[in-house]
Amino acid sequence: MTERAAAAPRGPYGAWLCLLVALALEVVRVGSNQNTLDPIYLPVALELLDAPEHFRVQQVGHYPPANSSLGSRSETFLLMQPWPRAQPLLRASYPPFATQQVVPPRVTEPHRRPVPWDVRAVSVEAAVTPAEPYARVLFHLKGQDWPPGPGSLPCARLHATHPAGTAHQACRFQPSLGACVVELQFPSQWFSQSATTRAELAYTLEPAGEGPGGCGPGTEEEPKEQALPVGSVELHPEDPPQHQEVPLDEVVTLRAPDVPVRPGQLFTATLLLRHNFTASLLTLRIKVKKGLQVTAARPAQPTFWTAKLDRFKGSKHHTSLITCHRTGPAGPDSRPLELPEFLWVDFAVENSTGGGVAVTRPVTWQLEYPGQAPEAEKDKMVWEILFSERDIRALIPLAKAEELVNTAPLTGVPQRIPVRLVTVDSGGALEEVTEHIGCESANTQVLQVSEACDAVFVAGQESRGAKGVRVDFWWRRLRASLKLTVWAPLLPLRIELTDTTLEQIRGWRVPGPAEGQLEPEAAAEEVERRSRGCRLQYQRAGVRFLVPFAAHPLDGGRRLTHLLGPDWLLDVSHLVAAHAHVQDPRIATLEGGRILVGREPGVTSIEVRSPLSDSILGEQALAVTDDKVSVLDLRVQPVMGISLSLSRGVSHPGEVTATCWAQSALPAPKQEVALSLWLSFSDHTLAPAELYDRNDLGLSVSAEEPSAVVPAEEQRAQLGVVVSGVGAKGLPLHVALHPPEPCRRGRHRVPLASGTAWLGLPPLPTPAPALPSSPARTPPFTEASVEGKRQVAGDMGSHVGPGIRGKFERAEEEAGKEENEAKEEEEDEEEMVPAPQRVTDLELGMYALLGIFCLAFLIFLVNGVVFVLRYQRKEPPDSVTDPASPQPHNWVWLGTNQEELSRQLDRCSSSSPPKGEGGCPCESGAGGDTSTVAPSASESPAGSTSTLARKEAGGRRKRVEFVTFAPAPPAQEAPEEPVGAPAVQSILVAGEEDIRWVCEDMGLKDPEELRNYMERIRGSS
């Protein structure tokens, strides 16, 4: 039972131990991963030139990208609008070095080939017939404007592929519109006599040539992979009807042509009768404007109807009256004409109706019946006929871009896309339409259209984005639609800080009065520091403003389509930096909208307010504390040139990724070398030196060879040296960070941190010999200056002058003078504690693992102690002397003979037990008095027994007596038992007649049973 109870805790504690081990391994794994993904990069400036609208983008939780390092940087840009005028440039600069490259062309589907122009192709006809065997396709250059000269625009060649053969035709882009139309005629053998066939259309772009229209003759070969798809066109065996039907009343319908008519053209309108027409007389009144006249009225069935035409000319209108009589027999058996057509009206168009501009001419139709009420005669139908000297085939809107990023809610500045309307005629000519245009947006919550219909825009009040939002345009009787994609920001903004807790930097003081409350100091030191005009430097953090953009479904669903993907964010820092501020500027301030500077301890937040409604678009809490951190070391990267690589992405046609590397090969003599610095703090944060004011950084550079390096010119290198000569083994440069010279007092002359950079290839690591331990670790090269003359202690190396990136602080003074100044101007001892070496994340994980194991062992030990104490409390008080002894038995006397009880007790006390047997302690109580006796073989009975004799004053009465037999202690001179012998407890045994009262509760009343029981007891004794 005891072993089972002791083994019970093993199960749950074993599970806890396994869980702790798994947690520790996860900590180590995460620590290992974090150790390889330090947020460092080469702080080179990357900028796009000649790109009107672009954004920096990043993946959630991946900044900088994984391929960035101390010597490289990678950035992804998103170009929203194409660039027909010139290819944009991406420039990378890290003074004094700079390079640039032309952004590669956009990648288009389906073959992911880059093309230098962004072209939109629109098919005008969806079907062609043998009567009109022409396929017309409009090509439009999207993007910004281009030079007016025709030399820079390419040609577009349309390719048609049919089972019967191939055909192609080219056109040259017009500089005025940036568009052209290809009219390709299909051969007659492509048309089937009974079935509809299909031809596939594709296009290619080619430089302008010397052929007709400025394009080359082309080849008959199939375009294969170079062609970009346009769509398909159907080839019908016969002409489809091109007319429209309009009812004049309940029984008469007008059928009119649905195509524009040209000057001098004749066309015919047809009247149709329903079968329930029963009238015998019908009068048709037609009123037309000048330029159009009715030439004839012919009945479709002269045997049943007659038609008489009367014409009346007016100053503005011409009226034609057509009277129709039924000539068939009248009566109940007469039936209406079986043919639906019963009257043909011929019209003629006069020349010079519109001066080349499309116009409409209204034609008024009115039916009159005999005996008709005067009110019914007022019902008229007006039909407009489109007149044009050109055979206009389609109205097409041209937009500069097909997608729009709605940044108006962030900036308050409307975003516009210019739109131009053009018409396409049968000869392939283009004409811009500027007057009498109508337009309407299908969803004003996503996109709006201007009153002049020359642009679509977003003003900031829109609440959604969408893909394929439609804007309708119409001109005369022609209609067209433009579909766009609008990306809307998903608020709130994400404000990303490189460090949300800014702390004081130990030992780093900068010029300027103390801002706010300083650290607790003595009054004398406070006055002294204020008199010197130096204050503590707080950490700084970089600030970036990010937001995802998405398009909502048009059907009102909840599934969003994200720009680039759900895990991509657009950097809008350049748009919202002017509207961002710190809520409490006493605690921190924003410099340039990109750098957060701590001022005094406190908690505040950065917030961005909308310029339209003053609402908060985004907020991020931050804290400035008076806790101190140390600069552990400097990470130095020499830059002797930069290389740039550009690549196109696959998530979006405008995605461009730029990767820049620092060249760190063996420098040539007199070569300038820039140094990139990163500060590593004891709170496991990293910051580039560019975050700090260059005047607050005191940097010194030293080398082993005194003449190896000299300072670089300040106006060229931000922090650099000129290398005079480097051996084949490379040259180490040692960089040290100090406070600025005005605040470099006393012990503050000790470098805050230092780092080493190798020019050329660093040497292979070799095992260091055993050296005697030194009391303190000192920098390998120490600099000093006396009256402006630069020296190096011990003649160990050379150094360069003041400044960060070209401005080196003055070197330190002599060691003796430094010690004197240190005694005169003693600073806080806390600030002068040497910065501890950085503990890596892997070491932290190992320490965490060790701590967890120790904690598990401690918990197990405490559990064991608690378990032992718990079971010790369950032992009886009489067995304290011998925990292995059995528990005592409380025997109950049920007899009435008090004298017999006394006699039995006296007999027990006077008898001497055999050797090896224990005594029989007797215990009885009356009135609360108890006594215990435990005789042994070496003790006298008088000193170990207690006899309880009770006499009752009221006569003989039946009593119940309680007697306790305690176990006897071991004999003092007992012989040693053999090893492994069982432990036997001796008890005092009386005769059968003396202990009958003892065993009655055991059910042993038969003498034979009692005798056997006593023999077993003696045998065990």
Curated annotation (Swiss-Prot):
Expressed in the brain in neuronal cells of the hypothalamus, thalamus, cerebral cortex, amygdala, and cerebellum. One of its GO terms (biological process) is positive regulation of Wnt signaling pathway. Disulfide bonds: none annotated. GO terms for molecular function: protein homodimerization activity. It is found in: Golgi apparatus membrane; Endoplasmic reticulum membrane. Residues 207-226, 793-835, 903-955 are annotated as: Disordered. Residues 870-1021 are cytoplasmic. Residues 821-832 have a biased composition (Acidic residues). Keywords: Endoplasmic reticulum, Glycoprotein, Golgi apparatus, Membrane, Signal, Transmembrane, Transmembrane helix. GO terms for cellular component: endoplasmic reticulum; endoplasmic reticulum membrane; Golgi membrane; plasma membrane. Residues 33-848 are extracellular. Glycans are attached at residue 276. Residues 806-820 have a biased composition (Basic and acidic residues). The chain crosses the membrane at residues 849-869. Residues 606-913 are annotated as: Binds to HSPA5/GRP78. Residues 929-948 have a biased composition (Polar residues). Belongs to the TMEM132 family. Interacts with HSPA5/GRP78. May play a role in embryonic and postnatal development of the brain. Increased resistance to cell death induced by serum starvation in cultured cells. Regulates cAMP-induced GFAP gene expression via STAT3 phosphorylation. This is Transmembrane protein 132A. It comes from Rattus norvegicus. The gene is Tmem132a.
